[in-house]
Amino acid sequence: RRVIPEPTCEAMATAMEKAQSELHKLGIGAVHNMDGATSFEALQLLRNTGRLKIRVTQSIARDNLDDAIDLGLSSGFGDEWLRIGPLKAFADGALGSQTAHLLRPYEGDSRNMGVAVASKEEIAELVGKAVLAGISCAIHAIGDRANRDVLDIFESVKAESAQRRLRHRIEHAQLLHPEDVRRFADLGVVASMQPVHILTDIPVAERHWGRRSRWAYAFRSLSKSGAMLAFGSDAPVETPDPIRGVYAAVARKQLEGTSDSGWYPEERMTVEETIRAYTAGSAMASSDELTRGTLARGLSADMTVLSRDIFSTPAAEILDVRVVGTVIAGQFVFRDGI
């Protein structure tokens, strides 16, 4: 029985207005929102009253897909502040709960291969329906079996997706079988990943996945294969702070206790590659690369000002970099001493 009432649209809008100010302090000017209908209603309220000061791509929950199709909504509909994004659905669970769907059993538990939240056939039906309606798809997949299944599904709709110019993505792509790494590039599927998880997941991955962890958070391998990488935070599961995410991708170390070379250092990214994945990569994930994501003539004047040149900052000092200014649409929405 539900005891705590759901927040009203007005209450959620008020909370969002405060939250966007906190995101501005972290240098964030755009987000991909995975929350549901009330959240979208609140965002529209902020937009219609001139209070939305962060760019939002709003996903469509599985339960709302039919309603969205009936209304004729498709990915990309909206304006520069609030746009319809992809269908969001789940293929499996998570690492910590040992419910990520694997090709082989978890270490020390020969009967557990994780959980398929929905069958491959169910997800294929959802994706097919979305594609025909002009809606791109973002499917949560953590385990190597879940990632393989979702790649198979995206392969089955490759022609229809290309015809409608839809760009699909796998959310997390956390553990991959090496044979599937190249498929992201071959299929044009975006690997939407959250480097900040590394800061807490290293011992858990080692415990549950063992030597398979070599292919966990395979940033470098995906990048070398030609895959599009889009980095984010998975907030509120992790902090939305992108500086911590940059550190995680570049150093691949916990804040304490990891070797100096990092965890599977062959998968480390450079600062430039990481920043590109957080900016241009995330814009590409939502098919917004022609309007934002890079500093170029004709694109939105959105930028983050840092306390020092992060590109020349040693990995060990990245966490010392501070955001001193955030500019959206050519206007400062946050500044600290500049």
Where are these regions (language model features)?
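Divalent metal-binding segments
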Residues: 1-71, 85, 89-146, 159-162, ...
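Short, charged, surface-exposed secondary-structure boundary motifs
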Residues: 66-69, 201-205, 262, 336-338
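Structured loop/turn residues at beta-strand edges in well-structured enzyme cores
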Residues: 26, 79-82, 299, 319-321
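Short amphipathic alpha-helices and their capping/turn segments at secondary-structure boundaries
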Residues: 66-86, 176-188
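His/Asp/Glu-enriched, well-ordered alpha-helical/loop segment
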Residues: 14, 127-138, 145-168, 172-173, ...
